Each structure stands twice: as structure tokens, then as C-alpha cells.
Regions:
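Second RecA-like catalytic domain
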Residues: 1-192
């Protein structure tokens, strides 16, 4: 994130930048630059792209910003996922069998991001009720905070990026957005 911000501030030679001690290892800086290039935030010469400029504006990690910017039709879902990942686990830590059974309904086999989306959407459908959250083994305080962060992100995207606001309602499209930003964290089950 800091390397992208430095690029946005016009620092061209990140490797030669005078970081405050302790400076990050050169290998970490090189890896960050390569990652930003793979996200298309930087071009082959290490210059900030238009996409990179937009990513740098966002109060998000470069990966999440890239995922959101991948497709405007998924902005609604992606902003929910961004908010939910920023607040920690919505599960209240209850180990009771009843709570575990209630939580299973939200689990998406495609991964944690879609599970978090399911939790938030169910919370919204239930009227953002504290009682509903408690009945489902969820932390009302965490969900309320995610709701507030999401509202801030919606305001940012609407104001700063002037995007057409849409909801895909298409899990495949959401997964493509996630892959655009988080491809480095993807794994493939090998059957073992």
C-alpha cells in the first residue's frame, strides 16, 4: 500500500527512496513493485497507470481496490466484502452446537469473501437486527461497524470515482472481481 502511495506522490525510484529506519529490505520493495505491476497499477517501466491512480485514491489495500475497480457491475457486492474484511470476524465466537448450525447457512464453499457477503446480506434482509444477529451467532457490533464502513466506501466511490452504481447479483462476476485483486492468494485443490 505504501509503495503505491509513494508512486502516487511522484516518487519514481522507490528502491532509492530514503525510508525512515528501519528501511524495508530491498527484496520486499521489489516484490511490492512486481505485485503492483501484476495488478496493472504500474506499467512495465514502473510508472503509475490510470488504474493505479484510481487505486491509490482508495482508502483500501491495492488488492481490494483492484477487485472493486475490475467491474463496476459488482461494486455493490465488492464494497460489502471490503467493509466486512476490514472489521474482523462477524462470528461471535460461540462454540455451541446451535450457533455452529446457524452459521453454516452462510458458508460459501468458494471462500471466506463470499461467506462474509452472505452474512452481511442476510443481516440486511433481517433489518440489521441485533436480535437476529444474536440468534445466528453473529456479533451485532461487528456487523454494525461493517455497515458504517460500507456507507463510507459507497460515498467515496460515488463521489471520487463517479461510477454507475449497480449490483451484479451474479456470483461468477463477484468471483472474477475477487480474482482480479487477490489472484496471488488463490489456491487450487490438488486432491491430496
Amino acid at each position: 500500500m505504501y509503495v503505491l502511495q509513494l508512486k502516487a506522490l511522484g516518487v519514481d525510484q522507490i528502491a532509492r527512496f530514503d525510508f525512515m529506519p528501519p528501511a524495508p529490505p530491498a527484496a520486499h520493495v521489489a516484490d511490492a513493485l512486481a505485485h503492483l505491476e501484476s495488478l496493472r497499477a504500474l506499467d512495465e517501466e514502473g510508472r503509475l497507470t490510470q488504474l493505479g491512480e484510481r487505486m491509490a485514491e482508495a482508502p483500501l489495500s491495492p488488492m481490494m481496490a483492484r477487485a472493486i475497480l475490475h467491474d463496476a457491475s459488482c461494486a455493490d457486492e465488492m464494497l460489502t466484502i471490503a467493509a466486512m474484511t476490514s472489521v474482523g470476524s462477524p462470528f461471535d465466537g460461540s462454540e455451541s452446537v446451535a450457533a455452529q448450525i446457524e452459521r453454516r447457512q452462510f458458508v460459501a464453499e468458494e471462500g471466506d469473501h463470499l461467506t462474509l457477503l452472505n452474512v452481511y446480506e442476510a443481516f440486511q434482509r433481517a433489518g440489521a437486527s441485533s436480535r437476529w444477529a444474536a440468534q445466528h451467532g453473529l456479533s451485532y457490533a461487528t456487523l454494525k461497524r461493517a455497515r458504517s464502513i460500507r456507507a463510507q466506501l459507497v460515498a467515496f466511490v460515488t463521489r471520487q470515482w463517479s461510477w454507475p452504481w449497480r449490483r451484479a447479483g451474479d456470483e461468477q462476476a463477484v468471483r472474477r472481481c475477487l480474482a482480479a485483486g487477490f489472484f496471488r492468494q488463490a489456491v487450487r485443490y490438488d486432491g491430496s
